[in-house]
């Protein structure tokens, strides 16, 4: 399976422009892909403006569904979601080309950015099976809390974390993501944004590791419709190689047992 991570330069609170930017990038994908991953809050940036929140009938999920169908590719990304007009979640959607989807609500809300004052935290994990591979979904700050993303019972093959992780803390990304890959005996894919917003500066820092902690990404750059140079990382997920490694080095069988108290 081919996975592409897009380090989108997100236009601040401009959904339509971000949709156009992404479509222009997808138009330039060479050799296609099975899964295209966008950063956290890809349609708005890391906003606390809850008036931008949508439900499942809103334009962002509908755009994800139509775009997945148009390009015959699964798409993942998050946006501010509300169901009842009161609670708002930082919700990631994993949308398949046939229009079906799964979602994950961010568990660990970034209090240093006051996300916890505006958003409601999630309490359910999400594992998506697509083309025979199981993906566990995480969002940004979740990467710092390994218990939450622990591959308990060997339930997933790939851990995906989508983020708005600022340049000032860029040094933490590599050890955190690589550790998640090694300790969970899984692939780990981290997808960060690029550009600037009202609070932070970002830089291309998406990363992909195999189950041994080896870097496996191929890097390329394309220009979006706004002229922004966009980093794309790609990798192949080899389920047979992963299964063989787990059979030959079954450290997962000696993992500690635990339960998370909500």
Q: Where are the predicted features?
A:
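Active-site-proximal beta-strand elements of phosphoester/diester hydrolases
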Residues: 1-14, 91, 133-142, 160
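Short, acidic/polar
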Residues: 17-27, 143-150
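Active-site catalytic loop in hydrolytic enzyme cores
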Residues: 83-154, 168-175, 244-251, 261
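CN hydrolase (nitrilase-like) catalytic-core segments centered on the catalytic cysteine
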Residues: 59-76, 144-230
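Short beta-strand scaffold segments in enzyme catalytic cores
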Residues: 77-79, 91-94, 126, 206-208, ...
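Cys-nucleophile CN-hydrolase/nitrilase-fold catalytic domain and related Cys-dependent amidase chemistry
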Residues: 15, 23-97, 103, 166-186
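Short, basic/aromatic-enriched C-terminal tail that caps enzymatic domains
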Residues: 232-234, 239-262
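Hydrophobic residues at beta-strand termini and immediately following loops
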Residues: 6, 104, 128, 191, ...
